[in-house]
Amino acid sequence: MLLAWVRTILVSNMLLAEAYGSGGCFWDNGHLYRADQPSPAPGHSCLNWLDAQSGLAFAPESGAGNHSYCRNPDQDPRGPWCYVSGEAGAPEKRPCQDLRCPDTTSQGLPTSATETEEAAEVPGGDEVFAPANALPARSEAAAVQPVIGISQRVRVNSKEKKDLGTLGYVLGITMMVIIVVIGAGIVLGYTYKRGKDLKAQHEQKVCERELQRITLPLSAFTNPTCEIVDEKTVVVHASQTPVDLQEGSAPLMGQAGTPGA
């Protein structure tokens, strides 16, 4: 099982190298062909893909990129192609040189499968690996190629981001400044209002303490327990008040105590 995984990894790496044009040939109509072939035929040079598409009114979106090499973005059965300058000066499609890889998959697959079975049957001793130059089957190539195509399309789309321009940057900076000013105004307004309220509370407490200090003696005099009560004074004199004597009211005894005196 381990040998099968090792063989699969080696074959996948070889397939990726071939798909990116490291050997100059291509598989499956060259949809993933990436070799630097700038001329479809002697005497002709490929035009830049972006310039050629901008010069055509009904040019499809190829997504080949900003270069002038042979590619096959529309999966043309004839293989990679490019735009060349026609007789009238208009860009026209021209197939590139057919550089298909030799079809050795039918021979390589049984050989590699047999070698894998033989390696699995060896009970011990030296391990036998499949040759590194064995090419994979077309089913394996088809399973790996779509992932590469998606990554290529994502890479092209990331490069085609539009620049906002000077006006966009100015508007963005202006909005940021406005937001910062509004936030600073809110903070300053809250701080000022809070300080004003605290100052008013402090002044009110000072006034209350001053009023208490002024009104304290008056309250002491109005206290019922401290009121002064006026008392009546009785004066006793030493001399007796004279009494008028009337007739018949004289006493029978004098002061000396002698009757009839």
UniProtKB/Swiss-Prot annotation:
Residues in the Cytoplasmic compartment per record: 188-261
Positions of the UniProt region annotated as Disordered: 90-122
CC terms in the record's Gene Ontology section: extracellular space; plasma membrane
GO MF: endopeptidase activity; phosphatidylinositol 3-kinase inhibitor activity; signaling receptor binding
Transmembrane intervals: 167-187
Entry membrane topology: Single-pass type I membrane protein
Domain Kringle: 24-101
UniProt superkingdom: Eukaryota
Protein name: Phosphoinositide-3-kinase-interacting protein 1
Phylogenetic classification of the source organism: Eukaryota, Metazoa, Chordata, Craniata, Vertebrata
Gene: PIK3IP1
